[in-house]
Regions:
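PEST-like low-complexity, intrinsically disordered acidic/proline/serine-rich tracts
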Residues: 19-274
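Cleavable N-terminal signal peptides
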Residues: 7-8, 18
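Positively charged n-region of N-terminal signal peptides that target proteins for export
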Residues: 1-5
């Protein structure tokens, strides 16, 4: 097990709502069973305009089921699931790396991910946020969706006001890219491009380049479940697009806690690799 991976787990355990002293508040909009507990199997809430309401605090279901190795096998016809450390863990043959990208991935992995931006209190990429053990909060309005990430205090904007996705290179590259969203029935479809070059998709260092486009499909089959199918199309680093599924669960009656990565950071000077 990588030393850096264990450090991430230790940080996540300290920062998670279950381990922290933070007041809970029983929200009135949470569907509840007769015993007063949240009814996770209830239908998802809807907004005033009839769309699925994705508002809430969510955490990665795979990680909090206690799994650290390979993810569970997806049913036939569904995208493979991913893990905190390895986005390609559910693919039998791994990711379709181009030769240079595979070499970079191996170098990052063998170096204990010491150059991962997250390890240096820098922003994580979108895929890392999806699979990170720390929770995230979705705030949904008709024209804008904000995702607040507890890890490294990340803030992401998804514009749902009808604006087109800019061409790659037309705007300043961002850590989180530029995102626009639209609805296909009850599915929220988010397209993102204009990423910074040299990105990390996971802790092991699967590359993401400035030529990437990411498409996320958000669905909520019930109140308690959030599914995000993520398609990575990065012809600079991979020979073909690929799709993974991230399963998350809602954390009702809880909020994010303050997480200032640099406040107590003392490990960077001691991180080593090959």
């Amino acid at each position: 097990m990588m030393r850096s991976f264990l450090s991430f787990l230790e940080v996540a355990a300290i920062a998670s709502p279950a381990a922290a002293q933070w007041p809970s508040f029983a929200r009135k909009d949470v569907p509840r069973a007769t015993d007063g507990k949240p009814d996770f199997d209830a239908p998802p809430l809807r907004t005033a305009d009839g769309h699925i309401d994705f508002t809430g605090v969510f955490e990665n279901l795979w990680f909090y089921n206690g799994r650290i190795g390979r993810p569970p096998v997806s049913p036939p016809g569904e995208p493979p699931q991913t893990t905190f450390a390895e986005i390609g863990a559910g693919f039998k043959e791994g990711l379709p790396f181009r030769p240079w990208a595979r070499e970079l991935y191996q170098q990052r992995k063998e170096s204990n991910a010491k150059d991962n931006p997250d390890a240096h209190c820098l922003p994580m990429g979108l895929m890392q946020f999806h699979i990170h053990p720390q929770p995230r909060k979705i705030v949904q309005t008709p024209d804008l969706i904000i995702i607040l990430y507890e890890g490294n205090a990340g803030i992401r904007q998804i514009f749902t006001d009808g604006r087109p996705l800019p061409k790659n290179g037309d705007v300043q590259p961002w850590w989180y890219g530029y995102s626009t969203g639209h609805w296909e029935g009850d599915t929220l479809v988010v397209d993102t491009n204009n990423f910074r070059d040299g990105g990390w998709l996971d802790i092991n260092g699967s590359p993401l380049t400035d030529q990437a486009k990411m498409t996320e499909r958000y669905t909520r089959p019930n109140y308690g479940t959030l599914r995000v199918d993520v398609t990575i199309d990065d012809p600079k680093a991979y020979t073909a697009p690929f799709t993974v599924r991230v399963n998350q669960k809602i954390v009702p009656d809880e909020e994010l806690i303050e997480f200032i990565c640099a406040e107590n950071e003392r490990s960077t000077a001691h991180m080593v690799g090959k």
